Amino acid sequence: MFRNAEEKDFALYMELAQEFYHSPAVMHPIPTQYMENTFREAMRSDVYIILRILEVDGEAAGYAILSRSFSPESGSPICWIEELYIREAYRGHGLGTKFFSSVRKEFPTARLRLEVEPENTGAVALYKRLGFTPLEYVSYVVEPDGADA
């Protein structure tokens, strides 16, 4: 049901990522080049990023991107759920719950973190049901010179 992406999945990943980044779940789309960079990095190594394809009965139901780091704040590894996209036809059937269960089994000592648009009420409800709680942080970012903001 959840498998690591392979080189042959490039077109599928690009299709799914385009769907995700043109959905109400995100604040704004990202350049296609960023998606391509993400796929290339996931194929190069799983040190920073893991790209999973979610399948139901052999059909692509979505994808997820995980990244790993260590947090001094929690004194433990962190597994960021960078992106989780489940196609509309597959929502509400427990796929998200099963995905998080598989992540928890794979990274049992890691703190799980994610970000969500408050308007994405279905995702917010899932995350709360799974025990996620909001952090009272404001995130800031600065892009490298020449990068799109």
Predicted regions and their residues:
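A short beta-loop-alpha structural element at the N-terminal edge
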Residues: M1-E15
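Conserved acetyl-CoA binding element of GNAT-fold acetyltransferases
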Residues: S76-E88
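Conserved acetyl-CoA-binding loop-helix of GNAT-fold acetyltransferases
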Residues: I86, G92-K105, A125-R129
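Hydrophobic adenine-recognition pocket in adenosine-nucleotide-binding enzymes
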Residues: A5, L84-I86, V116
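A short helix-loop-beta-strand connector motif used in the catalytic cores of GNAT acetyltransferases and
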Residues: E41-I53
